Amino acid sequence: MTSKRAEVLAKNSEMSRDEWLIERRKGIGGSDASIILGLNKWKTPFELWLDKTGQVPVSESQSEAAYFGSLLEDIVAKEFEIRSGKKVRRKKAILRHPEYNFILANVDRMIVGEKAILECKTTSAYNLKEWEDEEIPESYIVQVQHYLGVLGPEYRKAYFAVLIGGNKFVWKEIERDDELIDMIFKAEIEFWNDKVLGGQAPALDGSSAAEEYLKKRYAETENNKAIDLTAANRERIQQYLLIKEQISELQSQAKELENQIKHEMKDAEYGFIGNYQACWKPVVSNRIDTKKLKDQFPDVYEKVKKETHFRRFGIKEVS
């Protein structure tokens, strides 16, 4: 374990939003740690690899939840001060580990007079159980332990301030866990050296990013080319067909239940039971009748039609 202090990579106040996004791509931050460990619900290691290797554009876009989370950060931090009696200050910089310059930290707040940090969160009321009693989501525990690891061994504690559903506030604290920090950094070092610098892609997953990657990389085909698949693909194909069959059966069961509920609703647009609401409302949809357009206005159809190319995947049993 190093006793050196974290270094300032860049000051947030001296960077534009675009520059800040580019700097984040140059290393592994706290929110990346849970992705690498497979604990993140929203992003996979493969998607992170695409981002860190520059294979997807640096994205400025953020979800509405993330937008309001950023907007409310000051309010959450001030409420923490009121409830805890502690004082906090901003650390307006991207920090980096003194030995591993690709391990970065962008800490929300530092605790004044204490070797500790504050992480501010906003979350939906649906996630209330994740914060009940002593509970803290694993991905956030990993995030702050990553930060404590970057800051150095003298930083012994992290606090969370959380606004839940816009009307419930909780704050919690956790101690530094050196064993967990070592495990996190080991995984991050391996990911950066082997995957990012070494160009070795993580295992493909079911994300839309992985699908787009394959579409772009293998957009062109060799006409009628056929290959012998490796032995491992026999089991993959069998599992694929089984899952597709299960999906079809489940969709049929779901449709049956849906029809039974609709039958009871009759001409009502809404139905209520307990804390559930069923909705069956009329929807107006305007679409172009392409067949009619082609028949009656062939010249216009030729001008506006768009030809697309894609590869269709399918599996069938052959003799």
From Swiss-Prot:
The lineage of its organism: Bacteria, Bacillati, Bacillota, Bacilli, Bacillales. It comes from Bacillus subtilis (strain 168). This is Uncharacterized protein YqaJ. It comes from the Bacteria. Disulfide bonds: none annotated. InterPro entries: Lambda-type_endonuclease, NF-kappa-B_Signaling_Reg, PDDEXK-like_dom_sf, Restrct_endonuc-II-like, YqaJ_viral_recombinase.
